[in-house]
Swiss-Prot record:
It holds the Pfam family IGPD. Coiled coil: none annotated. It comes from Staphylococcus aureus (strain N315). It is an enzyme of class 4 (lyase). Mn(2+) 2 binds at residues 62, 66, 134, 159. It catalyses: D-erythro-1-(imidazol-4-yl)glycerol 3-phosphate = 3-(imidazol-4-yl)-2-oxopropyl phosphate + H2O. Belongs to the imidazoleglycerol-phosphate dehydratase family. GO terms for biological process: L-histidine biosynthetic process. The gene is hisB. It is found in: Cytoplasm. This is Imidazoleglycerol-phosphate dehydratase. Mn(2+) 1 binds at residues 36, 63, 158, 162. GO terms for molecular function: imidazoleglycerol-phosphate dehydratase activity; metal ion binding. Disulfide bonds: none annotated.
Length: 192
């Protein structure tokens, strides 16, 4: 199933769709480094993303990065509500040369982000690295996930961010994996 949403504000105009059919993705955020990270997200999560974004990137990349995270989170929440029968938990360690990242995801209905990643530099190219946390906070809060992101070792900032994105994507993909168990994956009987 394809989930689609538009978001139009004074700062951004977004048209985003997500599906779990692994169809080809098209990503145009206007921010080269973010395009690269979201391409990794699609490959490693098994999800398909189509993004057409325009924003005030002449100011900086903050609004478009955060707003894309908001919409991806909202679309993931719709997908989760429709799925009902999924593994729920996902954990992944990703090494990238000198770097090691760990991400743990719980599709809990309780939004929480622990972001423990001191990135080595403030920029990768023109991309402000502080936006990595802003992006994940937007996704996690809007998808109502509990997520722990830990950069265990680092060195090269590009590698650090790439390892985090890959680990999150793989952990999310595991958590979203369909299961034959017809019970809601919570002893409470509900995930809200």
């Amino acid at each position: 199933m394809i989930y689609q949403k538009q978001r139009n504000t004074a700062e951004t105009q977004l048209n985003i769709s997500i599906s779990d059919d692994q169809s080809p993705s098209h990503i145009n955020t206007g921010v080269g480094f973010l395009n690269h990270m979201l391409t990794l997200f699609t490959f490693h999560s098994g999800l398909s993303l189509n993004i057409e974004a325009q924003g005030d990137i002449d100011v900086d990349d903050h609004h478009v990065t955060e707003d894309i995270g908001i919409v991806i989170g909202q679309l993931l929440l719709e997908m989760i509500k429709d799925k009902k029968h999924f593994v729920r938990y996902g954990t992944m360690y990703i090494p990238m040369d000198e770097t090691l990242a760990r991400v743990v995801v719980d599709i809990s209905g309780r939004p929480y982000l622990s972001f423990n990643a001191s990135l080595s530099k403030e920029k990768v190219g023109t991309f402000d690295t502080e936006l990595v946390e802003e992006f994940f906070r937007a996704v996690v809060i809007n998808a109502r996930l509990t997520t722990h992101i830990d950069l265990i070792r680092g060195g090269n900032t590009h590698h650090e961010i790439e390892a985090i994105f890959k680990a999150f994507s793989r952990a999310l993909g595991i958590a979203l994996t369909a299961t034959d168990d017809q019970r809601v994956p919570s002893s409470k009987g509900v995930i809200e």
